[in-house]
From Swiss-Prot:
One of its GO terms (cellular component) is plastid. This is Small ribosomal subunit protein uS4y. SMART domains: Ribosomal_S4, S4. Binds to the translation initiation factors TIF3E1. NCBIfam families: PRK04051.1, uS4_arch. PANTHER family: 30S 40S RIBOSOMAL PROTEIN (PTHR11831), SMALL RIBOSOMAL SUBUNIT PROTEIN US4Y (PTHR11831:SF47). GO terms for biological process: translation.
Length: 197
């Protein structure tokens, strides 16, 4: 019997560009990486790969006849998914709108961007740090993945986690130290040299 220790997913999640040194592409990628606070180009390529697969699916469905049951069923499912993630409006219920989607539409729906746009973080990079340090929750679920795609109905539930000092949970390290020092002085004991500094 084969002992399987690790299950590996061999599916590709991103695709490298064919030509590595294209000035226009490099400049455009750098602008997006800076604007949306991505860690590396691979994060951008991952979004581009997802978008290309969705557009290919839409293109394939558009080749079928309008009355084709497969086109109706799969097309509606694809549009429903795009609406759920806020990539398309409720009014945009045609497959042609899927072909018009851009990388920016996807990057706008990332948790990192939404945390920054909602004013919870000082910058896009600060938003990433808050998410990685487990300060952000979506509904009841604590999420520490900056690339988490936020659904439309979940967007109003993005908030600081219950244990986070930012959300009024457990006080932070400095605040706890100051509270201890204040309690010592109130009880009459003179504070340590550390508290004087």
């Amino acid at each position: 019997m084969v002992n399987v220790r690790f299950y590996r997913n061999y599916g590709k999640t991103f695709k490298k560009p064919r030509r590595p040194y294209e000035k226009e592409r490099l400049d455009a990628e750098l602008k997006l990486v800076g604007e949306y606070g991505l860690r590396c180009k691979r994060e951008l390529w991952r979004v581009q790969y997802t978008l290309s697969r969705i557009r290919n699916a839409a293109r394939e469905l558009l080749t079928l006849d309008e009355k084709n049951p497969r086109r109706i069923f799969e097309g509606e499912a694809l549009l429903r998914r795009m609406n759920r993630y806020g990539l398309l409006d409720e009014t945009q219920n045609k497959l042609d709108y899927v072909l018009a989607l851009t990388v920016e539409n996807f990057l706008e729906r990332r948790l990192q961007t939404i945390v920054f746009k909602s004013g919870m973080a000082k910058s896009i990079h600060h938003a990433r740090v808050l998410i990685r340090q487990r300060h952000i929750r979506v509904g009841r679920q604590l999420v520490n993945i900056p690339s988490f795609m936020v659904r439309v109905e979940s967007q109003k539930h993005v908030d600081f986690s219950l244990t986070s000092p930012f959300g009024g949970g457990r006080p932070g390290r400095v605040k706890r130290r100051n509270e201890r020092a204040g309690a010592k002085k109130a009880s009459g004991g003179d504070g340590d040299e550390d508290d004087e500094e």
